[in-house]
Amino acid sequence: MAQKIQSVKGMNDLLPVGQKDFKLTAVFWQAFEDTVNRWTRAYGYQQIRTPIVEQTGLFVRSIGEETDVVGKEMYTFSDSNDSLSLSLRPEGTASCLRAVVEHNLLYNSPQKLWYMGPMFRRERPQKGRYRQFHQVGIEALGFEGPDIDAEIIAMSADLWEKLGIREYLTLEINSLGNREERAAHRAALVEYLTRYEAQLDEDSKRRLKTNPLRVLDTKNPDLQEICNAAPRLVDYLGEASQNHYARFKAMLDGLGIQYIENSRLVRGLDYYNQTVFEWTTDKLGAQATVCGGGRYDGLIEELGGKPAPSIGFAMGIERLLLLVSEYGSLEVNAAPDVYAMHQGEGADLQVMKYAQALRAQGFNVIQHSGYQSLKAQMKKADNSGARFALIVAQDELADGTVTLKDMNGAHGQQTVSATDLTDTLQQWKNA
């Protein structure tokens, strides 16, 4: 027997049933996708779909060459024809904005776009963190004021309500100011951290040289006291940045959205400025961040477009659905309405015709395939979770009748005219 080929470590199959190490099912995932489609339409967002492979330079320019994502986590390879460096996308914003700039989508008006799809990072797989993972992203492009900052947070809070997990999530916010303010803070931060360089771990020492703001994001418990006493970026904000942040917080207060100000919240990508935020939970162990985002007012210009202030966020679907499956609520209905079975010569063709007619009227129908006893077919109908069973027997073909059974028992089992089949099922379903 040939050796089985396994899936790549950290990249999961999504199956009709849960697995030992990955309990999410395809039907649960699809129910979430349906919810997201309704949710984004309600806020006026249009979907965009981009390739999973992009030029590596896109992410170097947008995310930052010295970030962990670009430096250590991307899957990068060369195109064999022209040696062009390509990468599997590690996040969705850069690809979305590349498409916006390439196709001039901001020519006439601002855009509200959303996407959903797989991303890839070479990380150590663990619960809630995978090498292929999926994100839903929201991007509001060409909007300058703090009102859109507050709106997208209210939008995310609305989704948490729909999923029944609002009480398990905490909103953390911060302001990163503008480029000049960050530069002044960076100088003070480097001076401060250099005094403690001997106490820093290797990762923080590397970040001190490449991206010192990210040192504040360390999870090392031995460094928390040092980081807590570090210069705060909020103390370096100018009047315009302070006003933007204050108006943003006032809007959250007015909307009744509670938040925690976290002066060490910096996010892991270099393109952020002004407002940044994360939704976190204590229900998923180390993988606390479920959703995060912020402003990236200079990114579109950095990618070759005209300046356009923008903001967005992304949520990890696997991590979010792990939380929903444990603590939330998501209406999932994978069971068919009808399991159609047949018995005797000629009944197999007739049941196929009835099944097609029912599907045309909006019923979900599983048609039994093969030639088993009625008892065996009924067992499969029961296992399918179908609400109703349709039985077409050879001796009923001549008089044009069928047998219907309510698997829940409410209407029992009845013989009805084939012409009344759809109406009877509709009445039973609505009862």
Swiss-Prot record:
A Pfam family the protein falls into: tRNA-synt_His
Domain of life: Bacteria
SUPFAM superfamilies: Class II aaRS ABD-related, Class II aaRS and biotin synthetases
InterPro entries found in the cross-reference section: aa-tRNA-synth_II (IPR006195), aa-tRNA-synth_II/BPL/LPL (IPR045864), Anticodon-bd (IPR004154), Anticodon-bd_dom_sf (IPR036621), His-tRNA-ligase (IPR015807), HisRS-like_core (IPR041715), HisRS/HisZ (IPR004516), HisRS_anticodon (IPR033656)
EC class name: ligase
CDD domains for this protein: HisRS-like_core (cd00773), HisRS_anticodon (cd00859)
GO annotations of cellular component type: cytoplasm
GO MF, one example: ATP binding
GO biological process: one example: histidyl-tRNA aminoacylation
EC number: 6.1.1.21
Primary localization: cytoplasm
Cross-referenced HAMAP family: His_tRNA_synth
SUBUNIT field: Homodimer.
Stated family: Belongs to the class-II aminoacyl-tRNA synthetase family.
Protein name in the entry: Histidine--tRNA ligase
